[in-house]
Amino acid sequence: MKNKVFLIGMPGCGKSTIGELISKELLLKFIDMDIYIEEKTSKTISELFEQGEDYFRDIESEACKEIIKYDNVVIATGGGVVKKGINVETLKNNGLVIFIDRPVEKIISDIDVSRRPLLKNGKERIIGLYKERYDIYNKACHKIVVNDGTIDEVIEEIKKIIINN
């Protein structure tokens, strides 16, 4: 079993919820990268984005370098972590990267945009991000899990992947 598991995917695909549940079931530590960044900087993700997306992405890259030091951990990354090639390389070289692929229609129906700075422009923005990032997520991962069933089904599938790798 890999001792570091990185969950990647669109905002609203279930990374944080699924990651926390899996970590409890497998007795692993759980880190939500956005919360890690907020605690480290004493600012919300929205506040950091107010200083520019590039500024935020630099902080996110630093967080990637820091979180790989943890062992026996499931990490829910930020949705845009894959935008920087160095982050993809860091994650892929240091653990198992799983892309949680949730159909964009389900993300739109489930998501609370108030906590997601890049999604405040609504449905069109989410669809645009999905199209922009889909291939990047596919290339950045070791495994893909489609999240269009029940949460229990997704958790079981991911647990099997983790245990068998």
UniProtKB/Swiss-Prot annotation:
Protein name: Shikimate kinase
Binding site for Mg(2+): S16
Native species: Clostridium botulinum (strain Alaska E43 / Type E3)
GO cellular component, one term: cytosol
Family: Belongs to the shikimate kinase family.
Cellular compartments annotated: Cytoplasm
Catalytic EC class: transferase
GO MF annotations in UniProt: ATP binding; magnesium ion binding; shikimate kinase activity
Pathway as given in its UniProt record: Metabolic intermediate biosynthesis; chorismate biosynthesis; chorismate from D-erythrose 4-phosphate and phosphoenolpyruvate: step 5/7
Binding site for substrate: D34, R57, G79, R133
Listed EC numbers: 2.7.1.71
Keywords: Amino-acid biosynthesis, Aromatic amino acid biosynthesis, ATP-binding, Cytoplasm, Kinase, Magnesium, Metal-binding, Nucleotide-binding, Transferase
Cofactor: Mg(2+)
CC cofactor note: Binds 1 Mg(2+) ion per subunit.
GO biological process: amino acid biosynthetic process; aromatic amino acid family biosynthetic process; chorismate biosynthetic process
Subunit structure and binding partners: Monomer.
HAMAP family reported in the protein's UniProt record: Shikimate_kinase
Superkingdom field: Bacteria
Function field: Catalyzes the specific phosphorylation of the 3-hydroxyl group of shikimic acid using ATP as a cosubstrate.
Listed Pfam families: SKI
Catalysed conversion reaction: shikimate + ATP = 3-phosphoshikimate + ADP + H(+)
Main location (coarse class): cytoplasm
Binding positions (ATP): G12, C13, G14, K15, S16, T17, R116
